């Protein structure tokens, strides 16, 4: 840190800002950023918004702002959306079964392997057999309707519908990149530039937030 600026090699702004504001608390509830990140030994520009102590309305407003940026500055649009929640795995799979082998098979969507380890009737197998557009409907049969993850996913799906996005997919296979990612995540895939994905997710570590980021 030099003259109130952060200098560091980073592959992600969220983690860097989380560390910084843990050491130097701020009253700001929203932070916008842009800068270089290093991934796969290459530099790329990342832009993003972090919402601290986030409310649903604030996060959705930030997403609308980001989509406006995509439309106006990048001349692109969101083609389809992927939703997921990092609490789903614990809701669907007993802790004793969350072995490295089984988690790897879930991430790879290895149905034949999962049938061997879990059985054909296991909720994860039954959900993964369905088209990802239908998986949220199937999920309702396997966890209580008042489960926080299911409630949150339904809220987001309804809101996305009001914004005109009907092509919505569920991902139950994703595992958190860091331990503080504990809630809902979203991926907005572009219509024209298919390599670009606006990603976002809820986290709770030393501070609570919801970040949205896009690598250009």
Question: Which stretches of residues belong to each language-model region?
Answer:
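TRNA-recognition modules of translation machinery and tRNA-sensing kinases, especially anticodon-binding
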Residues: 1-216
């Amino acid at each position: 840190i030099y003259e109130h600026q952060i200098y560091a090699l980073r592959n992600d702004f969220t983690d860097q800002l989380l560390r910084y504001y843990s050491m130097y608390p701020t009253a700001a509830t929203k932070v916008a950023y842009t800068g270089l990140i290093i991934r796969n030994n290459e530099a790329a520009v990342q832009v993003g918004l972090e919402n601290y102590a986030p409310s649903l309305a604030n996060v959705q407003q930030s997403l609308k702002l980001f989509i406006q940026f995509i439309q106006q500055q990048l001349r692109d649009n969101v083609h389809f959306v992927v939703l997921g929640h990092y609490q789903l795995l614990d809701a669907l799979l007993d802790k004793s079964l969350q072995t490295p082998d089984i988690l790897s098979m879930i991430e790879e969507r290895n149905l034949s392997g999962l049938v061997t380890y879990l059985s054909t009737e296991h909720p994860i197998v039954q959900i993964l057999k369905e088209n990802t557009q239908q998986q949220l409907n199937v999920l309702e049969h396997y966890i209580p309707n008042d489960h926080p993850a299911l409630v949150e996913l339904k809220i987001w799906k309804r809101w996305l519908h009001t914004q005109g996005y009907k092509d919505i997919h569920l991902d139950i296979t994703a595992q958190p990149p860091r331990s503080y990612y504990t809630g809902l995540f979203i991926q907005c895939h572009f219509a024209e530039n298919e390599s670009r994905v606006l990603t976002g997710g809820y986290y709770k570590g030393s501070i609570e937030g919801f970040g949205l980021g896009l690598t250009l």
